[in-house]
A protein has these predicted regions:
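C-terminal scaffold of the Radical SAM
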Residues: 1-166
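Short secondary-structure junctions
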Residues: 69-70, 178-182
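A short, conserved structural fragment
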Residues: 75, 180-185
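Short amphipathic alpha-helical interaction segments
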Residues: 165-180
Length: 185
């Protein structure tokens, strides 16, 4: 959901509408910033995105409001009531297999990624025709890192080392040294 797409409303609309969503007692919410593309209906009608400061302020407002209402902020964009984590999303954030159904969907079975066509016409004519992605072990390992760092759970380095046949601390020593003050080991 997005409450602060327009530069002109200065976040007022979001702060007015958001409490109404809380009254619905929805068990899981994902909050994303709407990207306004030039050729979209929004772009063509002159809707301007808000600036990054307002976007950050609104995200902070939403985060604090949801946490005060008992939601768990477990991934960059995801919040849930206790016991209502998204099982599908957790699968890819925790480096597990997952299924993707429909036009443009991606999935991973037995460690092999696939993408369905993004062409609705092709998908409707031919059904799912997954294109399998040939990833190296190093590419899969990097993807696992990036996904894990999106969550409050982080990355289990021992498990990563075993699965990707590498030494995380050795492989990323320069990066870790550069940002050591921000990491918890």
């Amino acid at each position: 959901m997005n409450f602060w797409t327009s530069k002109s409303n200065n976040g007022r609309c979001g702060k007015k509408i958001f409490p109404q969503f809380l009254s619905l007692d929805i068990p899981h919410l994902s909050i994303y910033s709407l990207q306004i593309e030039e050729n979209s209906i929004f772009g063509k009608t002159g809707v301007k995105p808000c600036d990054s400061d307002l976007e950050a302020d609104m995200f902070e407002y939403i985060t604090k409001t949801l946490e005060a209402a008992g939601y768990i902020h477990y991934e960059i964009s995801s919040f849930c009531k206790p016991g209502h984590y998204s099982k599908h999303n957790l699968a890819y954030w925790q480096d597990k297999d997952f299924y993707g159904f429909g036009c443009g969907a991606s999935g991973r079975i037995n460690g092999i990624r696939y993408d369905n066509t993004t062409s609705l016409k092709e998908y409707c004519s031919n059904g799912p025709c997954p294109v399998y992605i040939d990833e190296t072990l190093a590419e899969r390992g990097m993807d696992a890192i990036m996904m894990a760092l999106r969550t409050k759970f982080g990355l289990n380095i021992r498990e990563w080392n075993l699965k990707y046949q590498s030494d995380f601390k050795e492989q990323y020593a320069q990066v870790l040294d550069k940002y050591r003050e921000y990491f918890l080991f």
